[in-house]
UniProtKB/Swiss-Prot annotation:
GO terms of biological process kind: translation
GO cellular component: chloroplast; chloroplast envelope; chloroplast stroma; cytosol; ribonucleoprotein complex; ribosome
A Gene Ontology molecular function term of the record: structural constituent of ribosome
Primary location recorded for the protein, binned into one broad class: plastid
One Pfam family per UniProt: Ribosomal_L19
Descriptive protein name: Large ribosomal subunit protein bL19cz
Task performed by this protein: Located at the 30S-50S ribosomal subunit interface and binds directly to 23S ribosomal RNA.
Provenance organism: Arabidopsis thaliana (Mouse-ear cress)
Subcellular location: Plastid, Chloroplast
Transit peptide location on this chain: 1-70
Keyword annotations of the record: Chloroplast, Plastid, Ribonucleoprotein, Ribosomal protein, RNA-binding, rRNA-binding, Transit peptide
Family: Belongs to the bacterial ribosomal protein bL19 family.
């Protein structure tokens, strides 16, 4: 290749110039005859740099070619990126369809929920048979209780409500009264079928939820008319 470049100027000097024939064409033909083993693309590109006005149309610059190649590569990468984004969107849509296709699970009912439902139903049935008034701590109530041994006889208990224990169908109240100077406390389940009637005689406002302090107070604080 080096020898061919040294022969190029000699060939140009040996060939006489003709005014009618352009020396550029002669230089191109002599160069091709002296260097037949060279790559035609490389020779044409280099000759076009030396002779920008060639009639053969080989005036494409290497920089333009590089820019063309880079632009082509950029176009290919953009097309590939668009295809990749489209594939990702398709896969996401398929995943969403699969997720939507799964059947929804029914909520599990725990044992505590079952017991709460049963208690609520039992309370509704008991209130239909015998309505229960609103009882609060400090109220004075009168309870008519049926004696199991003698169902014709009703025992009446009257006292002050010391506390109330909420437990669904097993809700209880504690009543205190003074009998012969001694404090007596009785616990009644308000939804018991043996209780025939519960009547609130009077309401009293108290600050505490449990009046256990009455055990240590004077009996007159636990008495009522």
């Amino acid at each position: 290749m080096a020898m061919s470049f040294h022969r190029l100027p000699q060939a140009l000097h040996m060939i006489p110039r003709n005014p009618t024939q352009s020396s550029k064409n002669l230089g191109f033909s002599s160069f091709l005859s002296c260097a037949p083993s060279m790559d035609s693309r490389i020779s044409v590109s280099r000759l076009s740099l030396n002779h920008p006005g060639s009639k053969f149309g080989f005036s494409l610059d290497t920089r333009v070619r590089n820019e063309f190649i880079v632009r082509a590569e950029e176009g290919n990468t953009e097309a590939e990126s668009e295809e990749f984004v489209a594939e990702i969107a398709d896969t996401e849509g398929n995943v969403e369809e699969v997720v939507e296709a799964k059947p929804t699970r029914k909520p599990r009912i725990k044992l505590g929920d079952v017991m709460g439902i049963l208690n609520q139903k039992a309370i509704e049935v008991a209130e239909k048979v015998r309505p229960v008034p609103e009882i609060r701590t400090g109220d004075i109530v009168e309870i008519k209780l049926e004696v199991p041994e003698n169902k014709r006889r009703l025992s009446i208990y009257k006292g002050i409500v010391m506390s109330r224990q909420n437990a669904g169908i097993h809700t209880t109240i504690r009543i205190r009264r003074i009998i012969a100077g001694i404090g007596v406390e009785i616990v009644f389940p308000i939804y018991s079928p043996n209780i025939k009637e519960i009547k609130v005689v009077s309401h009293r406002k108290v600050r505490r939820a449990r009046l256990y302090y009455l055990r240590d107070k004077l009996p007159r604080l636990s008495t009522f008319k």
